[in-house]
Amino acid sequence: MIERYTLPEMGALWSEQNKFQKWLDVELAVCEVHAEMGTIPREAVAEIKGRATFSVERINEIERTTNHDVIAFTTNLAESIGEAARFVHYGLTSSDVVDTANALLLRDSCDLLRAKIDGLMDVLKRRALEFKNTPQVGRTHGVHAEPTSFGLTFALWYDEMRRHRERLKRAKEAVAVGKISGAVGAFAHLDPIVEEKVCVRLGLKAAPVSTQIIQRDGYAEYLSTLALIASSLDKFALTVRHLQRTEVREAQERFARGQKGSSAMPHKRNPIISERICGLARVIRANSLVGMENIALWHERDISHSSAERVVLPDSTIGLDYILQKTTSLIDGLVVYPERMLENLAATRGLIFSGQLLLALTRKE
């Protein structure tokens, strides 16, 4: 995701530095388990842990020759470790490291997103209570229908986010899965106990069955969940955009001192935050389709998923993190015009009560 839409904490989580740190965490956990089981010398593991460092710049430099990022990474580790480096990556294939590290990144991302959802729900609850007795005309097909409460809108959104919080919990369970099963997933050079112990150390579940990679339906579930959440935020923002139209003007985004609406029309106050939320939601929805496309791979694995995941996993996660914060700020600072709501209620001169009249006539003898 471009820097413009990247918040610091989530951006740091998805940085190259943190990605390689997670790779190192996996490699070290495997070394420690091997040492416990007597596969490699304990003193070698102590040396590896004490000396292992990496440089993103150096890894990129090596990769220009190897054209393989994991080999570039382990080569750079070997430069700092020395002789004991021969035990790093012992029995592993690249996806053991990459997929298990991805599980750590996605798990931590879910925790940050969950906190953002909780913050949005707090604001929605407060505003629902604030406007529970504020009458507003309800609209169906964009046309005045019957009276409702503006607070009911926020209550509806609160309940929707409650469901999303549960969906995100399930998505976290789907992606917080590691695998240390080697090439084609057959444990040819590894004891399955290694996988179990490594995953426990890292706070992950071990994949019950894997090929050379963790199966991508879990990633697809994660990306689809993010798309669902983004779609709700899209809906919230779209409602604000409608309410801010000049002809309606029942609510509008907070307009800060010094903010400008147009380079040509200085009177304009545009719902730019809402429009930005709607736009980024489209990106997140589109990325969920890529997650589904990545499920069908050749036999025990191919690498067609890799290039796509390098884009859609961070972009969808960072993008949703951003629009969650923007939606929270939008709702928190939303300027509401109850008087205008009353004017719009009266605009049809009582026609919005036609349903009441219909029932009265039906009951008439």
Predicted features, each with a name:
Residues 33, 76, 80, 123, ...:
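Generic, well-ordered alpha-helical scaffold segments in large soluble proteins
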Residues 1-22, 26, 46, 62-66, ...:
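Glycine-rich cofactor/substrate-binding loops
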Residues 195-288:
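Acidic, glycine-rich loop-and-beta core segments that form the ion-binding/anion-interacting portion
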